Swiss-Prot record:
PROSITE patterns per UniProt: PHOSPHOKETOLASE_1, PHOSPHOKETOLASE_2
Similarity comment: family membership: Belongs to the XFP family.
Cross-referenced SUPFAM superfamilies: Thiamin diphosphate-binding fold (THDP-binding) (SSF52518)
Tagged with keyword Acetylation: no
Organism: Lactococcus lactis subsp. lactis (strain IL1403)
Coiled-coil regions listed: none
Top-level taxonomic group: Bacteria
Disulfide bond residue pairs: none
Protein name from the UniProt record: Probable phosphoketolase
InterPro entries, alphabetized: Phosphoketolase, THDP-binding, Transketo_C/PFOR_II, Xul5P/Fru6P_PKetolase, Xul5P/Fru6P_PKetolase_C, Xul5P/Fru6P_PKetolase_CS, Xul5P/Fru6P_PKetolase_N, Xul5P/Fru6P_PKetolase_ThDP_BS
UniProt entry keywords in alphabetical sequence: Lyase, Thiamine pyrophosphate
Length: 822
């Protein structure tokens, strides 16, 4: 039986750590000749990279932690995966996966011999190779850690509903200063040890950032303990006065990590066997504070140049100077080669590797085997079970729209709220997928009309519940929205999605912008993952923009920002789907599609306020499938017939106003031939240069079928910023666009006045339509002038009523559709 705490075993662990750290340091500088001292081959200029790139400072600390995580897996037969918050030390995951064989399984050309090791060294941070972070190219990684702050949020999402898994989550002490990371310490208030896995957070307290000390590093152990105990954790420390007494570190780390794992197991046992922690008691989850110096074991001082301090060069080890490349060594500058050789040989590589590049026999069995290897844990590659959700038939939840009631408000007000219509569908999904679907949000689920979900589930919340002051809160539930943090909600969803489950994150449209950058990072991950043949795909990430810009008359200007549409439109279109359904049926049909799509970001803009319902189930299905459709009942031109102008819209309020505008024109000039186009999927309109943009793009012929040849007037009511549609039509080479979107004007005002602020309203759209008809000699001057004057007088009346009485003119807000004159 293996004695995992014996000196012999810890010495083997130390050797494995040295092997990993040797490789992690060497690949920054060398592109070949990786075992120069073992093979007796002196380093030449051609062996070195011309421009070494990488981060050394965090590597040795993280390989130390990775080695001890392997020990825990072996000792406790524990399923575990590694998450590196300070992900710029990418070698800390690349190298362990190479040593345990996972890397070679993913990349067969990177063999576990001298030739394969040389290839690995060359490709690291090298053109055409791999990045310096824990990218999607790295086996075992599901968190790149390039943009700091999300490791605990991702870890939480990853272990929800996975009771057998532990996330070994390393938090950089610089990362710990970010807002998202600081708020994510609260994640333990939402983890139920009865049904979920666990996180073992390790604060990698190496002391320094790029050029500054870290706040936690200059905080006493006593105060750090108070801080984490106040958050509900049970802190324990790994530190030693002599930073080079590595065996002392190993012995202490083994004791600390053993106690941490045993505490986690006891917490889970108490919850699962005795139903503990289900009444407001939060477990004292362990956290490990590891003071592992930056650049640990690397060059200690700059003895070759620069100023001196106490007779020595400026410190590198345990200093910010170790952050990136600690030596100015390259193929063009070999002045510090002796220091590099001294550094690398300090790991005694001849005791770790054979001359053929293989690992010494005694070290080959140190790493776990098969799927117990952290780099081969299925959780990190699309999940243990990444199948799509079991979906109900969305049409069973649809509104009964027909030609008799389209464009009108339905008798039950709740049926006119698209988000409430969606909530019925989501509630059924919860029942069909009790452990594989979750809804996340920042305290907005009730506000965003997911009312029906609360009939079948609760919010998951582990703190004390105080009824009747609290509502729909329980230790078990499929909704997690009780922390007011968009970062947390998005991070939880990303972790949940990247481990093969499906969820959605709904937020106020303007404040979804808080996680712009997180969505960018997720896009970059799935884009890069798609290039890795060994990687499985993922469920799509579903984000819902609601409480939208034209429905924020009550909260005002700060709550008005539809810019997420523009932000995501800039990304590679093959990975982005942006939907603007105009009613409840189309929203249902869109989600039926979104939940079946893979490795996409689905951004759905949805209305939560009572609005007219427009489309039959068949029309909604076509709109969701095709992303765009000509609506015959709102057009006066027949299919294939030349038109005088095109009306188009995308979004709930734009659709109402554009349809009302064309109705106004039709009432006075029924001879006008126009086509109405409803756009649901924005990406169908785009025509972008470069690869990975064409998956859903309309051909030029298809685009012309909808919008006519260049020069055809197009009145476009749009939910977002106008320049997005303008840029799309510019790329299409289509002149004649007049877009009415959000113009960054708004306030606390009336519902209809919000539309007038940006001239999205029907009257401004109708004025533009009549003007182009007049300019193109489709209508006489007298008729056009009279119509335009009437529209302007109506707008003046609107202004007077809203400013004097604080209400809208009922004719505007209560308008309903009636058949066109044809």
């Amino acid at each position: 039986m293996t004695e995992y705490n014996s000196e012999a075993y810890l010495k083997k662990l130390d050797k494995w750590w040295r092997a990993a750290t040797y490789l992690g340091a060497g690949m920054i500088f060398l592109k070949e000749n990786p075992l120069f001292s073992v093979t007796g081959t002196p380093i030449k200029a051609e062996n070195l990279k011309a421009n070494p790139i990488g981060h050394w400072g965090t590597v040795s600390g993280q390989t130390f932690l990775y080695a001890h995580a392997n020990r825990l897996i072996n000792k406790y037969d524990q399923k575990m995966f590694y998450m590196g918050g300070p992900g710029h030390g990418g070698q800390a995951m690349v190298v362990p996966s190479y040593l345990d064989g996972s890397y070679t399984e993913a990349y067969p050309e990177i063999t576990q011999d001298l030739e394969g090791m040389s290839r690995l060294f060359k490709r690291f941070s090298f053109p055409g190779g791999i990045g310096s972070h824990m990218t999607a190219q790295t086996p075992g990684s599901l968190h790149e850690g390039g943009e700091l702050g999300y490791v605990l949020s991702h870890a939480t999402g990853a272990i929800l509903d996975q009771p057998e898994q532990i996330a070994f989550a390393v938090v950089g002490d610089g990362e710990a200063e970010t807002g998202p990371l600081m708020t994510s310490w609260h994640s333990i208030k939402f983890i139920n040890p009865k049904n979920d896995g666990a996180i073992l957070p390790i604060l990698d307290l190496n002391g320094f950032k790029i050029s500054n000390p870290t706040l936690f590093a200059r905080t006493s152990d006593v105060d750090i303990r108070k801080f984490f105990e106040g958050l509900g954790y049970s802190p324990r420390y790994i530190e030693n006065d002599d930073i080079h007494d590595y065996m002392a570190y190993h012995k202490l780390a083994a004791e600390v990590f053993d106690k941490a794992i045993e505490d986690i197991h006891q917490i889970q046992k108490d919850a699962r066997e005795d139903n503990r922690y289900q009444n407001g008691e939060i477990p004292a989850w362990p956290i490990v504070i590891a003071r592992l110096p930056k650049g640990w074991g690397g060059p200690r001082y700059n003895d070759w140049s620069g100023p001196k301090f106490d007779g020595k060069g400026m410190p590198i080890e345990h200093s910010f100077r170790a952050h990136q490349v600690p030596l100015p060594l390259s193929s063009k500058n070999m002045g510090t080669l002796p220091e590099f050789v001294k550094w690398m040989t300090s790991y005694q590589p001849e005791t770790l590797f054979n001359a053929d590049g293989s690992l010494k026999e005694e070290l080959r069995d140190f790493a776990p085997k098969g799927e117990m290897r952290m780099a081969s844990n299925p959780v990190t590659n699309g999940g243990v079970d990444s199948s799509n959700l079991v979906l109900p038939d969305w049409q069973e939840f649809a509104n009964p729209i027909s030609e008799n009631n389209r464009g009108k408000l339905l008798p039950d007000t709740n049926d006119n709220m698209d988000m409430n219509v969606l909530s019925k569908y989501f509630a059924e999904i919860v029942k069909l997928n009790p452990t594989r679907f979750r809804l996340f949000g920042p305290d907005e689920t009730m506000s965003n009309r997911f009312w029906e979900m609360f009939k079948v589930t609760n919010r998951q919340w582990m703190q004390v519940i105080k009824n009747p002051n609290d509502e729909f809160i329980s230790p078990e539930g499929r909704i997690i929205d009780s922390q007011l943090s968009e970062h947390q909600a998005e991070g939880w969803l990303e972790g949940y999605t990247l481990t093969g489950r499906t969820g959605a994150f709904a937020s106020y449209e303007s404040f979804l912008r808080v996680v712009d950058s997180m969505l960018t990072q997720h896009f970059k991950w799935i884009r890069q993952a798609a290039d890795q043949k060994w990687r499985h795909d993922y469920p799509s990430l579903n984000v819902i923009s609601t409480s939208t810009v034209f429905q924020q008359d009550h909260n005002g200007y700060t709550h008005q920002d539809p810019g997420m549409l523009t932000h995501l439109a800039e990304k590679k279109s093959d990975f982005i789907r942006q939907y603007l359904p105009a009613d409840g049926n189309t929203l249902l049909a869109v989600f039926d599609r979104a939940f079946q799509d893979r490795s996409k970001i689905n951004h759905i803009v949805a209305s939560k306020q009572p609005r007219q319902q427009w489309f039959t189930k068949e029309e909604a299905e076509k709109l969701a499938t095709d992303g765009i459709a000509t609506i015959d009942w709102a057009s006066t031109a027949k299919d294939g017939e030349a038109v005088d102008l095109v009306f188009a819209s995308a979004g709930a309020e734009p659709t109402i106003e554009t349809l009302a505008a064309l109705h106004l024109v039709n009432e006075v000039f029924p001879q006008a031939k126009f086509r109405y186009v409803n756009v649901v999927e924005l990406g169908r309109l785009q025509k972008k240069k470069g690869a990975l943009n064409q998956e859903r793009e309309l051909s030029d012929e298809e685009f012309e079928k909808y919008f006519g040849p260049s020069g055809t007037p197009v009145i476009f009511g749009f939910h977002g910023y106008e320049d997005l549609i303008e840029s799309i039509f510019y790329q299409r080479g289509h002149d004649g666009l007049i877009v009415h979107g959000y113009r960054e004007d708004g306030d606390i005002t009336t519902t209809y006045d919000m539309r007038v602020y940006s001239e999205l309203d029907r009257f401004h759209q109708a004025i533009d339509a009549m003007q182009v008809l007049y300019v193109n000699r489709k209508v006489n001057q007298g008729l056009a002038k009279a119509f335009i004057d009437r529209m302007k007088r109506t707008l003046v009346k609107h202004f007077e009523v809203t400013r004097n009485e604080g209400v809208d003119i009922p004719d505007f807000t209560e308008w309903v559709w009636s058949d066109l004159k044809k």
